[in-house]
A protein has these predicted regions:
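Charge-patterned, long linear interaction tracts outside catalytic cores
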Residues: 147-167
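Intrinsically disordered, low-complexity regulatory segments
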Residues: 1-143, 147, 166
Length: 167
């Protein structure tokens, strides 16, 4: 949606995620105790594999590249901030000025008030850091423990590749 010198677009959930171990090193495509634990030196991002995601990401990227300033209006909270920052990073637009629209209500008055009170996006860097920490720690614990228990004990669940255990 474009007009009056601005454009509005949207994401739907997480369009961007952390790469899988095998994308860092092909040897990690094979699950083995010899390669555990695996923690990347620097986490890399990728698009979630979905045609709708790919199309929407390219729309967002084109708009970000044209923009002089980007306003983040994702959900007010850690995950909303993470969704925006991961997209911003994958678009290579992290050097662009960003502002934050923080909405606690969707009433017309609340939306107008929030637009009048746009904040510097970097005021929310700590919120992003917390979300990123949660995302990366979930990745480290989840992928390493799943691989460990699957290789060590085989499939113990009801079917597919599910692994069940008590923590």
């Amino acid at each position: 949606i474009e007009g009056h010198g601005c454009a509005v677009t949207w994401a739907f959930g997480h369009l961007v995620t952390l790469q899988e171990p095998g994308e860092y090193d092909p040897i990690l495509k094979r699950w083995s105790l010899d390669t555990l634990p695996f923690v990347p030196d620097k986490f890399q991002l990728k698009l979630i594999q979905n045609r709708g995601v790919d199309e929407q990401f390219h729309i967002i990227k084109a708009l970000f590249e044209q923009a002089e300033e980007i306003v983040c209006a994702t959900d007010a909270g850690r995950e909303g901030e993470l969704i925006f920052r991961y997209i911003l990073a994958l678009c290579n637009c992290e050097d662009k000025p960003i502002r934050r629209l923080w909405l606690n209500s969707l009433t017309p008055d609340a939306i107008l008030a929030a637009f009048r009170d746009l904040q510097d996006g970097h005021n929310y860097d700590s919120l992003y850091a917390a979300a990123r920490c949660r995302s990366e720690s979930d990745w480290i614990v989840g992928l390493n423990s799943t691989r460990y228990y699957t290789v060590r004990h085989g499939r113990i669940g009801g079917g597919g590749d599910r692994v069940l255990w008590t923590i």
